[in-house]
Structures are given as structure tokens and as C-alpha cells.
Amino acid sequence: MRIAVICFCLLGMAYALPVKHADSGSSEEKQLYHKHPDALATWLNPDPSQKQNLLTPQNAMSSEEKDDLKQETLPSKSIESHDHMDDIDEDEDDDHVDNRDSNESDDADHPDDSHHSDESHQSDESDEVTVYPTEDAATTVFTEVVPTVETYDGRGDSVAYRLKRSKSKMFHVSNAQYPGASEEDLSSHVDSEDLDDTPRAIPVAQHLNVPSDWDSQEKDSHDVSQVDDHSVETQSHEQARQYKREANDNSVEHSHSIDSQESSKVSQESQSREFRSHEDKLAIEPKSEEDEEHRQLRVSHELDSTSSEIN
């Protein structure tokens, strides 16, 4: 409905806009100049009587402008009528909701006339759906009554308070559940209900004190999960330690291999040095023997020469 009203308002505003006529003053002036040259010549004279004779076509145009002004005023009335219709529709919607609430309250107060009221409401709802398809049906939410367990801790004499509480409750409900019953009957009924309720508290306490199988299973699973987590942690620590040990062993072996290689190199160098020194010694010894032989020959030759001189 609001969209339709907005569309109508826009259309009314479009129709209300003034239409500009083609400016044909130049052609009219030319026609007047050809037809009435004397009148145009006298237009410059300040005689008001002659000017009124020439202003007759402008007066004719003023009537058209009046019609345009009348057309401009009409859409405002239509807009006001649309606003008035919107107000009427809103009032009808409010009345419809109030009537529906009153009908629901009447149904709750008078359940015996359900058939007649249902038929009338069904017919009304069918008519309302056809008239107002956009409205949502009013639904009532019913909450279920959940029984609660009352505790009597910190109330002095719990047994007496419980008896008073139960009796007051039963006296409040007596008119609705047991019409025409006396107070003695109600008190006996309360006592019987108290006696019936007393053994029911023992199994509840037993169930609360005794752990269920499900709780035990949950505890076992929790313990097993903790043990598994602990075992996983220990395994991870052991693996880390083994990795460290292997790394240390590898480093030690590598260092030993490097040391052995260095020692072998040193031993080879020492052996090569000894071999070279032995070869040098062997080369020096034959030279010394040759020198001694030369010396002996010289000595013997000198002795022979001296002996020959002496002779």
C-alpha cells in the first residue's frame, strides 16, 4: 500500500509541473508588424489607452495560465486524499488486531461455545485473509509446566515448613481440583501425598551417592587418555635422547677418524724422514771410505818417496 501511495504521489507531482509553451513572440511580432504597422508605431507613445488595445492577446493567454494553475492545485488534493486513505487503513488494521485479541480472550473464557465460535472465526479469518494478505496471524505460545524440586535448607524446621507449604498449596488448588471438599479431607490428602513422597527421596539420594557406569567409563577413558599422553611424552623424550646420543657418537667417531688420519699422516712423514736420513748416511759412508783409501795411497807414496831419497 505504501508503494502504491508513493507512486500516486510521484504521478501527481509530475502532472503538477507547469508545461512550457513554445516562445513564438518573434513570429507574432512580425505578424503584428505586417498587419498593424501604425499600432506598433504608436506603441512607443506613453498613451495607456492604446496599450490596452494591444494587450488583448496577452489577456487571452492569461486564461490558459489560470487553467494551468487550477491543474496545479488538483494533485495536492489527490495527495491529501491518499494520505487520508492511508490513515484510514492504519486505523482499520488497529481495529482488526483489537478484534482478534478480544475474540481470542472470549474463546479462552467460554470453551463451551467452541463450535460456533470456531466457525465464525474461520469465516472471519477467510475474509480477513482475502482483504489483508500481508498480515501475519497472531500465534500464542504455550509453555509446558516443568515440575521443580523444592529445597528446604536454611528455613528453620524444614518438616514443619514443608507441611505448611504443602497445605497452603493444596488449599489454593482445592477449589479448582476438588470442589466441595472439606479441610479434613484435604489435610488427609496432603498427609497421604507426604507419605507417598517420602520413599521417593531415598532412591534419588542413592542414585546421587552411587556413581553410574557411565561416569566410571568416562573416568577410565580420561585416565587412559592421560596415561597415553604421558606415554607419548616419555616416548618423545626417549627419542630425543637417542637422537642426541647418536649425534654425539657420530661426532666422536668422526673426530676419532680425523685423529687417526692425522696420526697416520704423521707416522708416514716420520717414516719417510727416517728413510731419507738412512739413505743419506749410506751415501756418506762410501765417500768416507774412498777418502781414506786416497789418504792411505798418498801416505804410502810419500813413504816410498822419502825412502828413495834417503837411499
Curated annotation (Swiss-Prot):
The modification Phosphothreonine is found at T234. It is found in: Secreted. InterPro entries: Osteopontin, Osteopontin_CS. GO terms for biological process: biomineral tissue development; cell adhesion; osteoblast differentiation; positive regulation of bone resorption. Residues 28-138, 167-311 are annotated as: Disordered. Residues 47-62 have a biased composition (Polar residues). This is Osteopontin. The keyword Glycoprotein applies.
